[in-house]
Design a protein with these regions (language model features):
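Alpha-helical transmembrane segments of integral membrane proteins
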Residues: 5, 14-18, 42-46, 102-109, ...
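Hydrophobic residues within membrane-embedded alpha-helical segments of Major Facilitator Superfamily
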Residues: 8, 22, 53-54, 110, ...
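The first (N-terminal) embedded transmembrane alpha-helix
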Residues: 10-31
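Membrane-embedded alpha-helical segments that form the functional core of polytopic membrane enzymes
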Residues: 24-25, 29, 36-61, 131-141
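Intramembrane alpha-helical segments
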Residues: 90-154
């Protein structure tokens, strides 16, 4: 349980409103349009947990990409120029509390459980959800600059 709490806290749960509010809005709109006839609480709850797990996993993946890019030095430079901000994005890596390999394991865990939630939604609602999931994953990985790094060779 301590490992789960460790990774949950380092996945920056403070950022969850960014993804959970739109997801909750979608559930509320779906419920109001369904008149109770075709609304599935199972799909709604699985969707909400899936969004949360995906967001946390992508936050950790972003840390991994930043760690690999060496963004700590860039943050120090910005601070030296007088700008304020969060100086250490991944203190659990720089302090030695976790290794990059453990971080990737945590990312895999969050994304695997998100995939299970997605499978529940697919079973209830059909395969069309996969397009949304694929788009979300592409955007999430792109946010970290991974795709642009792969294309440019950095």
């Amino acid at each position: 349980m301590n490992k789960l709490r460790f990774w949950f806290n380092n996945a920056r749960p403070i950022s969850l409103p960014q993804s959970m509010l739109p997801a909750l809005t979608a559930v509320a709109l779906s419920y109001s349009r369904a008149d109770g006839a075709q609304f599935s609480w199972l799909a709604a709850i699985a969707s909400l947990f899936g969004v949360m797990l995906l967001h946390l996993g992508m936050n950790l993946l972003d840390d991994w990409f930043d760690y690999k890019k060496g963004s700590a030095q860039a943050r120090e430079q910005v601070a030296n120029e007088g700008f304020r901000g969060r100086m250490v994005k991944y203190p659990y890596l720089t302090s030695g509390e976790a290794t990059p390999k453990q971080l990737l394991g945590a990312v895999g865990g969050f994304l695997a459980f998100a995939a299970v939630m997605g499978a529940v939604v697919i079973l209830v609602r059909g395969w069309m959800i996969l397009g949304w999931v694929a788009a979300t994953l592409i955007l999430g990985v792109s946010y970290s600059g991974a795709l642009s790094s792969l294309v440019s060779g950095d």
